[in-house]
């Protein structure tokens, strides 16, 4: 998967706050670039593209992964946009981030890739692993000294519970739309992909 390795604050200035990408907030109230071009009237396509980019950058996923999540959400029963957000939020890297074990989703992805996280007692090194209701997420005993709890400034969501002493968390239920920590209109993302 190709990752975004350039300046993250530039993306935040363009798209707005993205808690999964970086903790930093922008102090400049203008668009990135040398000459700070004022945005003209956005077309419908530009608005939909911007919402799609928010999802892509916040969760650190590629275009193909996002498209595959859209296709999977379309095949399921329910609102496609809400199902898409649920699948993205129930990824293991996103759960580790929301538990406060990492300050950003890229950091939580690295923790998972390096084998520091266990799910239901089994070592899992796949960041896209889909967590389910009742799953127990814990840090390996040998890895507890590298984890800084509370490095994430976001409050713990209601669908998760965390034991900070033992660095264990549990998924109480599948996340609802109102608990997603990202300001996004998921219907515009679905409309963007409906043309493909």
Predicted regions and their residues:
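Residues in the helix-turn-helix
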Residues: 107, 123
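Short, well-ordered loop/turn sites that connect or cap secondary structure elements
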Residues: 111-112, 131
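Ferredoxin-like alpha/beta domains used as RNA- or RNAP-binding modules
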Residues: 1-99, 126-196
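Beta-rich strand-turn-strand
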Residues: 102-105
């Amino acid at each position: 998967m190709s990752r975004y390795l350039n300046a993250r604050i530039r993306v935040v200035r363009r798209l707005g706050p993205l808690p999964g990408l970086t903790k930093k907030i922008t102090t400049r109230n203008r668009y990135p670039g040398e000459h700070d071009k004022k945005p003209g009237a956005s077309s419908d396509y530009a608005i939909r593209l911007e919402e799609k980019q928010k999802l892509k950058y916040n969760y650190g996923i590629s275009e193909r992964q996002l498209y595959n999540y859209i296709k999977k959400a379309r095949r399921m029963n329910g609102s496609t946009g809400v199902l898409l957000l649920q699948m993205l939020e129930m990824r293991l890297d996103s759960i580790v981030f929301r538990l406060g074990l990492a300050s950003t989703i890229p950091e939580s992805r690295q923790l998972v890739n390096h084998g520091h996280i266990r799910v239901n007692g089994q070592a899992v090194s796949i960041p896209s692993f889909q967590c389910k209701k009742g799953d127990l997420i814990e840090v390996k005993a040998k890895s507890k000294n590298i984890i800084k709890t509370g490095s994430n400034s976001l409050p713990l969501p209601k669908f998760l519970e965390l034991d900070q002493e033992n660095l264990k968390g549990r998924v109480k239920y599948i996340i609802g739309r109102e608990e997603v920590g990202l300001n996004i209109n998921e219907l515009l993302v679905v409309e963007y992909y409906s043309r493909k």
